[in-house]
UniProtKB/Swiss-Prot annotation:
Pathway of action: Phytotoxin biosynthesis
Species this protein is from: Alternaria solani
Protein origin, superkingdom: Eukaryota
Species classification: Eukaryota, Fungi, Dikarya, Ascomycota, Pezizomycotina
GO cellular-component term (any): membrane
A single MF term (Gene Ontology): heme binding
UniProt protein name: Cytochrome P450 monooxygenase sol6
Leader sequence residues: none
Family note: Belongs to the cytochrome P450 family.
Length: 461
């Protein structure tokens, strides 16, 4: 009787493994429901290595590769086993309607966020509750209340810039802008600022640790299990410096045995910061007070999202205005005409009425998209018809604010920085196609804050 040796078993196992992947590749390329759509064949066989190459190895270049693929193949490109990229403003409008039934793709969002947070929550019902809890802290009314404090922080930053200029010291505008926005968003989320503006060279370990953690996002979307292992290993080490900032604020609630007593909450929470609202069980019907770990997760997500997105747009805007003298002069003349003295108080509502300032900010947000990557959504159980073809439920449909804000059917000379496009007769039609803040039930809660940052920065600068 023949008894296979260890080498024989190894060869057999390898052969079966190779055969499995060959058959799987044949199925995905020729028999999968999405096989009719064109795109990179390697992506159709396996998302992981394709994403790793473009996003990690080439440092975030996948969105530009997808843009090239759309030019080659058209508005629909297969970019994964079960993934389609759509570059069509009208399809985007249909997908983002409140009644569309599209939901966040949990495979993607668990890689870039924490489960159960305002960004990471994929259940529509739970997401609505969390959004209702956070809305008061991020509303236009709250923007008005904190507008003077924002201007104080901008002035503090500019004083440091002036001191550097007097001593001929070079500063990093990226670090300066990120320090400003972090101090503002920490006030909104935690109830107090972290103090990044006062740090030497505007460098802060809190920001650097957050950036280091979220740089793993490129690996996470390609190899989710590896990312999970990396985060677990990080939690076992001393990589938790953000807790040193957040715990003093959350522990005062979590450590109390009477945390669910409304009177005790009311005595401690001024309801001005996100943490106060999260810890109040009466904030919204159906809201459950999160644990300390869940609070930390939400804080990290809000601080990171609020800092990176806003500061990147601000940096982009400053560059574009300084690089375009006609825009600079027109904007300066409008501001000087309405507010002759830099010491004059300017309110958020007054600034929103200035047409060229508003147009400039819209153009900054169009081209300097805070979140340029893909935002995948799952087709609902009822399915979805795309150009006459029925797509099966749970297919992941990817759209991108970067692509939507540059689509030539909507934007003439889409790569040109031109605030005047927002002052034409048909400019109101453009607003619904501005994909910067998403649309529908998933519209960005921080939209008003982004506008206020830009106004404060441009006015003072």
């Amino acid at each position: 009787m023949f008894v296979p040796s260890n080498i024989g078993w190894l060869v057999l196992s390898c052969g079966l493994f190779v055969a499995y992947w060959v058959l799987l590749a044949i199925y995905r390329l020729h028999f999968h429901p999405l096989s009719r759509y064109r795109g990179p064949r390697v992506a159709a066989v396996s998302n992981s290595w394709y994403e790793w190459y473009w996003n990690y190895y080439l440092n975030g270049q996948m969105i530009f590769e997808i843009q090239r693929l759309h030019k080659q193949y058209g508005p629909v490109v297969r970019i994964g086993v079960n993934d389609l990229s759509i570059d069509d403003p009208e399809v985007y409008q249909a997908m983002t309607k409140v009644s569309s039934g599209f939901t966040k793709d949990p495979h993607f969002y668990r890689c870039i966020s924490f489960p159960g947070t305002s960004i990471g929550e994929t259940d529509p019902a739970q997401s609505r509750i969390r959004r209702k809890v956070l809305t008061p802290a991020l509303s236009g009314t709250r923007v008005q209340e904190l507008a003077p404090a924002i201007l104080v922080k901008v002035e503090r930053l500019l004083r440091r810039v002036d001191l550097c200029a007097q001593s001929a010291k070079t500063i990093c505008i990226t670090s300066a802008c990120k320090a400003l926005t972090m101090d503002i968003i920490s006030k909104i989320v935690l109830g107090r600022e972290i103090g990044c503006i006062e740090e030497p060279d505007f460098r802060n370990s809190f920001i650097e640790n957050l950036n280091a953690a979220f740089e793993t996002g490129w690996i996470a979307t390609a190899f989710p299990r590896l990312a999970t292992l990396a985060l677990w290993m990080a939690s076992m080490s001393d990589f938790s410096s953000y807790l040193e900032v957040f715990d003093p604020h959350s522990a005062v609630y979590v450590a109390r045995e009477d945390v669910n007593v409304p009177s005790a909450i009311a005595a401690h929470a001024d309801r001005s910061a996100v943490i106060d609202m999260l810890m109040d069980p009466l904030t919204v019907k159906g809201h459950t007070v999160p644990s300390l770990e869940q609070l930390n997760d939400e804080a990290v997500i809000l601080l990171t999202a609020g800092n990176d997105t806003t500061s990147n747009s601000m940096i982009f805007g400053l560059y574009q205005i300084c690089n375009n003298m006609s825009v600079y002069k027109t904007l300066f003349q409008e501001l000087q005409g309405h507010f002759p003295s830099v010491d004059q108080q300017i309110t958020y509502e007054e600034a929103k009425q200035l047409p060229y300032l508003t147009a400039t900010i819209k153009e900054i947000l169009r081209l300097g998209t805070p979140l340029p990557g893909r935002l995948p959504r799952l087709i609902p159980s009822s399915g979805f018809q795309l150009y006459g073809q029925d797509l099966p439920p749970k297919t992941s449909i990817h759209t991108s604010p970067y692509l939507x804000n540059r689509h030539p059917s909507i934007w003439d000379n889409p790569n040109d920085f031109n605030p005047d496009r927002w002052l034409r007769k048909n400019s109101r039609d453009l607003d619904k196609y501005l994909a910067t803040f998403n649309r529908g039930a998933r519209q960005c809660l921080g939209k008003e804050w982004v506008h206020s940052y830009q106004i404060a920065g441009l006015w003072q600068d």
